[in-house]
């Protein structure tokens, strides 16, 4: 039995203390400074907290606009993490110097991934990078090591993925453009306020948003997903690295339409609903209300 239970965390940053005795509008702006990658989520959390406190129900249009803003951040974050923050853990640009560009085109076609980049020109660019010798944090048993690294990809796939790594810099910026149009700027949006949004949609803005979203969608379908499927077989063993306890929690995102009796009910009816996966949890052991 568990007569007393505690929950603790090791990531206290004190932002709640910073916003004490400030107006709700201030809080929504201040807490975003926690992160330059995911400020929208922090702003949303602050605005929702204020709305709960004051009993405010936002309009359906405001709900849609907030979901679009959160979705743009999702697009940016997924592209950023898969390519620009993590890809160099499994993609070796210097190994791409051994690639035959013609074979790289054949492999890209076979893998169903895009061939928008000039692989010949990229290989020349990488050669200049290697000749420069200034590999920064990647020097010493990283890109330039023959042994002792965990890189598994063949040279042609390294060349393809390096090209797409560079393309991803542009694509994640386009996702941030969507956030900037809706939020006034990105990072740290300005239009997200308790009670709704200060963004005023126009035909021109909506057309621009649609064009950017379509471009990102096409790139993810033609590049990011095929790249993932091409890379994964070389790192199957990594699926067991850093394996945790098998307990997962999600708070949900993208508020659905309608009125809900409680905030918990609203969270459960999000397009990506909240939930917990924990096969080891036995609630019968919990005796607290």
Region locations from a protein language model:
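Active-site bordering "gate/hinge" segments
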Residues: 1-289
């Amino acid at each position: 039995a568990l007569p007393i239970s505690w929950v603790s965390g090791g990531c206290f940053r004190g932002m709640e203390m910073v916003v004490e005795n400030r107006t709700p509008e201030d809080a929504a702006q201040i807490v975003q400074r926690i992160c330059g990658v995911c400020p929208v989520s922090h702003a949303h959390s602050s605005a929702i907290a204020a709305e709960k406190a004051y009993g405010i129900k936002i309009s359906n249009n405001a709900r849609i606009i907030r979901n679009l803003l959160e979705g743009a951040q999702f697009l940016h974050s997924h592209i950023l993490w898969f390519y620009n923050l993590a890809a160099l853990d499994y993609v070796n640009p210097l190994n791409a110097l051994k690639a035959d560009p013609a074979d790289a085109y054949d492999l890209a076609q076979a893998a169903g991934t895009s061939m928008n980049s000039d692989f010949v020109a990229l290989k020349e660019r990488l050669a200049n990078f290697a000749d420069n010798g200034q590999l920064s944090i990647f020097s010493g048993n990283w890109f330039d090591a023959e042994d002792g690294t965990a890189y598994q990809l063949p040279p042609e796939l390294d060349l393809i993925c390096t090209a797409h790594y560079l393309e991803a810099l542009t694509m994640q910026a386009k996702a941030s453009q969507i956030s900037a149009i809706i939020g006034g700027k990105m990072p740290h949006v300005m239009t997200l306020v308790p009670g709704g949004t200060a963004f005023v949609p126009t035909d021109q803005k909506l057309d621009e948003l649609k064009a950017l979203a379509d471009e990102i969608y096409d790139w993810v379908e033609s590049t990011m997903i095929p790249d993932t499927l091409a890379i994964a077989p070389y790192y199957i063993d990594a699926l067991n690295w850093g394996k945790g306890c098998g307990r997962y929690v999600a708070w949900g995102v993208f508020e659905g339409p309608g009125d809900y009796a409680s905030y918990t009910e609203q969270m459960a009816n999000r397009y990506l609903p909240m939930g917990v996966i924990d096969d080891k949890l036995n609630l019968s052991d919990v005796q607290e209300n």
